[in-house]
């Protein structure tokens, strides 16, 4: 079986993930909730993860890395926080509902213009079509890194380069 929806529900957790979750459940408190040993230990684990993620992403400041409970909430926060009334946003037909629903709501409620780049018969993003849509004056390009429907991977470095060249932000669903 080929299973492409790991972002939603990983079919089988690797043993190292199971071990880490069990260890955390048995020893850590709630980060930022107090001065108990468990709470302080949890805070150290979270901050260590934040520093590792910042290094992985090339982020100069770890305190600029924010965690969310899940990808849907993170995408909703990013999209709703960045897109303003009347803005123009470019996305793709490959996107998941965690991108499409907030964008459609913003279009209906805030007058945001949402334009979608298509894909070819094999489900690959039409980069030439995307390039035609990404023009100066857009607020953001919102794109998935890999489709959980087709399994195709999007060249997000190229998409980010297009977005930044047009003066736009780039939001990537990398879940």
What kind of region is each of these model predictions?
Residues 1-175:
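Pyridoxal 5′-phosphate
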């Amino acid at each position: 079986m080929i299973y492409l929806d790991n972002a939603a529900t990983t079919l089988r957790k690797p043993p190292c993930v199971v071990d880490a979750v069990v260890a955390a459940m048995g020893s850590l408190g709630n980060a930022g909730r107090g001065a108990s040993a468990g709470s302080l230990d949890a805070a150290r684990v979270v901050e260590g993860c934040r520093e590792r993620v910042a290094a992985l992403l090339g982020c100069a400041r770890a305190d600029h890395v924010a965690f969310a409970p899940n990808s849907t909430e993170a995408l909703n926060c990013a999209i709703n926080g960045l897109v303003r009334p009347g803005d123009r946003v470019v996305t793709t037909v490959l996107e998941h509902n965690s991108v499409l629903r907030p964008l459609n709501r913003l279009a209906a409620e805030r007058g945001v213009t949402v334009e979608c780049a298509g894909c070819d018969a094999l489900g690959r993003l039409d980069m030439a079509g995307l390039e035609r849509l990404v023009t100066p004056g857009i607020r953001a390009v919102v794109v998935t890194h890999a489709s959980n429907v087709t399994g195709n991977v999007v060249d997000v470095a190229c998409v980010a380069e297009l977005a930044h060249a047009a003066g736009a932000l780039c939001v990537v669903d990398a879940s």
